[in-house]
């Protein structure tokens, strides 16, 4: 009998795309401290657009979880997202010279629109498996790239803090929890988990590509 975890199986089924994402040029340049400000600005402006849909998805996780313990974990997660991570974005925009006007007027890239739609689709299903699957990809893929390079953090604080936000003890615990939840409930809804996992990973890779296709020059 196989002892492979369900979440590991899902990642293996998307191995090629997952590896392209976690070893992307963006990740390499981030650790090298060579990523251009215009690329970093584009990436962060678009990533910040996820916040509203991500909170919708987290809200759905609270209401569809089947026990108190996971509800409490997701509620805690909401507080964390609204705190330190939100502060990072605002500080980074200031450091990169991205004005409020730019943040408001620059349109979504296709991957941004696609991932926001996927999160809202998962939330609308009221299917706990779909919801946890999308949450897991959004977090686990980032933990993977953030922990693959053992070099000291970059000197640029915008780069260093983005890495740190995806490699600290509580973040590791969050991914462990999400994996345990999907390992627990996913096998009974295998097709749903496979579908949402595959689509989420594909969009994550496209999102990295888009940062280079749509650079943003700060105004101030």
Question: What are these model-predicted stretches?
Answer:
Residues 11-36, 175-184, 217:
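Short alpha-helical hairpin
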Residues 4-5, 9, 145:
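Long, non-globular segments of proteins
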């Amino acid at each position: 009998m196989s002892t492979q975890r369900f979440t590991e199986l899902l990642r293996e089924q998307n191995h090629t795309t997952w590896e392209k994402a976690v070893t992307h040029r963006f990740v390499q340049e981030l650790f090298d401290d060579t990523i251009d400000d215009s690329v970093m600005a584009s990436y962060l402006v678009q990533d910040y657009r996820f916040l509203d849909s991500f909170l919708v998805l987290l809200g759905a996780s609270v209401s569809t979880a089947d026990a108190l313990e996971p509800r409490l974990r997701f509620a805690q997660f909401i507080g964390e997202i609204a705190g330190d991570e939100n502060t990072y974005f605002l500080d980074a925009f200031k450091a990169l010279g991205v004005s409020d006007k730019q943040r408001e007027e620059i349109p979504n890239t296709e991957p941004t629109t696609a991932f926001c739609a996927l999160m809202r689709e998962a939330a609308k299903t009221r299917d706990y498996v779909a919801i946890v699957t999308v949450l897991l990809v959004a977090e686990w893929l980032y933990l993977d790239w953030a922990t693959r390079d053992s070099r000291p953090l970059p000197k640029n604080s915008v780069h260093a803090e983005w890495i740190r936000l995806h490699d600290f003890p509580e973040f590791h615990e969050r991914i462990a929890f999400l994996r345990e939840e999907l390992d627990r409930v996913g096998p009974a809804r295998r097709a749903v988990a496979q579908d949402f996992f595959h689509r989420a990973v594909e969009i994550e890779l496209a999102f990295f590509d888009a940062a280079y296709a749509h650079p943003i020059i700060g105004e101030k």
